[in-house]
Amino acid sequence: MNKTLPFVATHPGTLILDELVFRKMSQKELALRMGVQKSFLNELIKGKRAVNADTALLLEQIFEISAEYWMSLQSQFELDQARLKQKTKERLANAAAWSSAGTNK
């Protein structure tokens, strides 16, 4: 299957931050509502942590956006990362082939 590849993979944390801005809610307030440390939430927003099922359920409760949506975003992020990594490997292999072809003149 030939899937269109994004330029970068978008972590669900980006969308959590968008929701915070839209709702004029601080990270501290969201962390308090979720019952998590602010540092945990900050790492989630920065893409250093994955959205798991427990986190997705908390986000669903607070933002009224389905847990399935949050899990889908995480899944898509991971797939995009893997595809981008594979594409990079293919490009490096291709570049190496061209380099060695150029030295065999």
Locations of the language-model features?
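A short, Lys/Arg-rich alpha-helix, primarily the initiator
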Residues: 1-25, 72
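Residues within the helices of the helix-turn-helix
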Residues: 17, 28, 57
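Short C-terminal boundary/hinge segments that cap the last helix of small helical domains
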Residues: 65-83
